Design a protein with these regions (language model features):
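Catalytic cores of RNA-modifying enzymes
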Residues: 1-89
């Protein structure tokens, strides 16, 4: 991940890895389904102005549209932790 990259993080949890991504990337969109984690994420990421937290199910996010808006439609980097739970469609 470089300063030129737009990164989509699936399931940031409390934002620990998100901080490292924000340091390395141009911009990070972190999609978190659990709204109870939003206050923690807001606090953890308050010093990072290149992070957008999206409270949604990743299966409901239009990733193509996000890439178009945030990265001119160019390929994006996707990061997720191995313990992520993706709800069935």
């Amino acid at each position: 991940i470089t300063k030129d990259d737009f990164v989509l993080e699936i399931g940031p949890g409390i934002g620990t890895m998100t901080q490292y991504l924000a340091e390395a990337a141009r911009e990070v969109a972190a999609v978190e389904i659990d709204k109870t984690l939003l206050p923690i994420l807001d606090d953890t990421l308050k010093d990072w102005d290149n992070v957008t937290v999206i409270n949604n199910d990743i299966l409901k996010v239009d990733i193509r549209q996000l890439a178009l808006e945030k990265n001119q439609g160019l390929p994006i980097k996707v990061v997720a932790t191995k313990y992520i739970y993706v709800s069935p469609a």
